[in-house]
Amino acid sequence: MDSNTVSSFQVDCFLWHVRKRFADQELGDAPFLDRLRRDQKSLRGRGSTLGLDIETATRAGKQIVERILEEESDEALKMPASRYLTDMTLEEMSRDWFMLMPKQKVAGSLCIKMDQAIMDKTIILKANFSVIFDRLETLILLRAFTEEGAIVGEISPLPSLPGHTGEDVKNAIGVLIGGLEWNDNTVRVSETIQRFAWRSSDEDGRLPLPPNQKRKMARTIESEV
């Protein structure tokens, strides 16, 4: 059995115990108590699957947490603040652009747009977004630029459907890339997108997609809204 699986279960058991003590003092609100009940059922199921006693695991989890807290400084207990990363200038973000062959698709709370008239170009993706815990938190805007600076694609959040995950953004990037590469464009991404929004690119920043995936993604973006 993986040691991380065991220690994770042990810590979860102890933290549940702490939350239970908090609830016993009638300090928890309704959502807190609801999560407590659901997590209790989950821990019982995990304990049965792992063949571990919950009481024993709780004691072991307490030792792990105490050891961590002994090494923790007050500074480390502060909640990390979001960082705002910018590939684009204000002018690049606010510039109007037009499509000769407009295509767009709504994927969850994100809108993907591209000009399918663009062919045989080298295209760079740039984005402005916030990051927390070294992961993308909120996409502000992503745009695709030709080497000449023309905007040929875009991914933006829909104001009417707030909320998206890093995985949502990654999937949307895949759809945009697939559509652009279908027309024999070479697509590269900025370093910030590579690091926080698309972790599978190669050293040149190109987003390698096999031909069958390109075709699938190109078909996906065919539906106009």
Curated annotation (Swiss-Prot):
A motif (Nuclear localization signal) lies at residues 34-38. Upon interferon induction, ISGylated via host HERC5; this results in the impairment of NS1 interaction with RNA targets due to its inability to form homodimers and to interact with host EIF2AK2/PKR. GO terms for cellular component: host cell cytoplasm; host cell nucleus. A motif (Nuclear export signal) lies at residues 132-141. GO terms for molecular function: protein serine/threonine kinase inhibitor activity; RNA binding. Residues 204-225 are annotated as: Disordered. Keywords: Eukaryotic host gene expression shutoff by virus, Host cytoplasm, Host gene expression shutoff by virus, Host mRNA suppression by virus, Host nucleus, Host-virus interaction, Inhibition of host innate immune response by virus, Inhibition of host interferon signaling pathway by virus, Inhibition of host PKR by virus, Inhibition of host pre-mRNA processing by virus, Inhibition of host RIG-I by virus, Inhibition of host RLR pathway by virus, Interferon antiviral system evasion, RNA-binding, Ubl conjugation, Viral immunoevasion. InterPro entries: NS1, NS1A, NS1A_effect_dom-like_sf, uS15_NS1_RNA-bd_sf. The keyword RNA-binding applies. It is found in: Host nucleus; Host cytoplasm. Residues 175-210 are annotated as: CPSF4-binding. Residues 218-225 are annotated as: PABPN1-binding. Residues 1-73 are annotated as: RNA-binding and homodimerization. Pfam families: Flu_NS1. GO terms for biological process: symbiont-mediated suppression of host cytoplasmic pattern recognition receptor signaling pathway via inhibition of RIG-I activity; symbiont-mediated suppression of host gene expression; symbiont-mediated suppression of host mRNA processing; symbiont-mediated suppression of host PKR/eIFalpha signaling; symbiont-mediated suppression of host type I interferon-mediated signaling pathway. HAMAP family: INFV_NS1 (MF_04066). Homodimer. Interacts with host TRIM25 (via coiled coil); this interaction specifically inhibits TRIM25 multimerization and TRIM25-mediated RIGI CARD ubiquitination. Interacts with human EIF2AK2/PKR, CPSF4, IVNS1ABP and PABPN1. The dsRNA-binding region is required for suppression of RNA silencing. Inhibits post-transcriptional processing of cellular pre-mRNA, by binding and inhibiting two cellular proteins that are required for the 3'-end processing of cellular pre-mRNAs: the 30 kDa cleavage and polyadenylation specificity factor/CPSF4 and the poly(A)-binding protein 2/PABPN1. In turn, unprocessed 3' end pre-mRNAs accumulate in the host nucleus and are no longer exported to the cytoplasm. Cellular protein synthesis is thereby shut off very early after virus infection. Belongs to the influenza A viruses NS1 family. This is Non-structural protein 1. It comes from Influenza A virus (strain A/Hong Kong/212/2003 H5N1 genotype Z+).
